[in-house]
A protein has these predicted regions:
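A hydrophobic C-terminal alpha-helical subdomain
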Residues: 224-282
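Short loop/helix-cap segments at secondary-structure boundaries that form the rim of catalytic
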Residues: 39-46, 63
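Compositionally biased, low-complexity linear motifs
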Residues: 65-69, 282
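Rossmann-fold cofactor-recognition segment
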Residues: 44-57
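Oxidoreductase cofactor-interface core, primarily capturing Rossmann-like NAD(P)-dependent enzymes
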Residues: 1-34, 38, 56-59, 66, ...
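Conserved Rossmann-like nucleotide-binding pocket used by diverse enzymes
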Residues: 4, 51, 267
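Conserved beta-strand segments of the P-loop GTPase G domain that flank and frequently precede/overlap
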Residues: 74
Length: 282
């Protein structure tokens, strides 16, 4: 079995490679792709095949997918450019005759009104039309989106536009492990997995930060424009801030809520919880 992993220089792609190795896939049967192979040197030292590839360069993708049996297609990071970039990946996979494409999408991509969902929906539609066997991993939010803000929460509290909505966030490591399970076991072709961890509200997030830190941390719910301004004032570019605020709007209406059972079944255990992730981050 040869498995090609795109985006291996990114957080999720790297974790997927590590999960494949832990599951016993020989290093020489894993191909890690990145724009800059220098950033994959440590994997090469461990026997992983590394190749340069760029979603904007179809020739590099075709060369990178040579002899690939399975393709772990990690969605691109350039919001607004994903549709043409993902087209290049799918077309290169089709030309290479890849046996299975596993794509990281977003929760409820086919029906979601999140700004982030449109490009994933278009990619899913193109995958279906391509004739390639595929699996859709519709990942919800990352727990790291919250644990990475711990210092800010302690200083300023938790702010957002999520209301009482619940978000099914899980760690990148758990999403990566689930992807590795799909890549190394049979019976997944054609499946759509809605993946997420145990759900929580922003009020529950603030309460858990309070419990673990001993500080009084509260959640302040804001209108979407006001929350966007908070994010911009914190240094985020306006388009990115607007996208994050829109995600909170979606959380308020259930856009990032999924039952935990799909992820739990793939992992063979319950996913890491918010409380556990905060404990590690603290």
């Amino acid at each position: 079995m040869s498995v090609v992993v795109t985006g291996a220089t990114g957080h999720l792609g790297r974790l997927i490679v590590e999960s494949l190795l832990r599951r016993g896939v020989p290093a020489g049967q894993i191909v890690a792709l990145g724009r800059t192979v220098d950033r994959l040197a440590d994997l090469a030292d461990r026997g992983v095949v590394v190749r340069a590839a760029d979603y904007t360069d179809p020739d590099s993708l075709r060369a990178a997918f040579t002899d690939a049996e399975k393709l772990m297609f990690v969605s691109g990071s350039e919001v607004g450019q994903r549709v043409p970039q993902h087209h290049n990946v799918i077309e290169a996979a089709r030309q290479a005759g890849v046996g299975l494409v596993v794509y990281t999408s977003i929760a409820h991509a086919d029906t979601s009104d999140l700004l982030l969902a449109a490009e994933h929906r278009a990619t899913e539609e193109e995958l279906r039309a391509s004739g390639l066997p595929y699996v859709l991993l519709r990942n919800s939010w990352y727990l790291e989106n919250y644990t990475g803000q711990l210092a800010n929460y302690l200083a300023h509290g938790v702010a957002g536009s999520a209301g009482d909505g619940r978000v099914s966030a899980a760690t990148r490591a758990d999403y990566a492990e689930a992807a590795a399970v799909v890549l190394t076991t049979e019976g997944h072709a054609g499946q759509v997995y809605e993946l997420g961890g145990e759900a929580f509200t922003m009020t529950e997030l603030a309460a858990e930060v309070s419990r673990q830190s001993g500080h009084d941390v509260r959640y302040t719910d804001l209108p979407v424009p006001a929350y966007t301004e908070v994010l911009v004032s914190a240094g985020l570019p306006e388009p990115y801030a607007a996208t994050l605020a829109d995600a909170d709007r979606g959380i308020a209406h259930g856009a990032l809520y999924v039952p935990v059972e799909h992820l739990e079944k793939l992992l063979g255990r319950r996913p890491i919880t918010l409380a556990e992730a905060l404990r590690v981050a603290g």
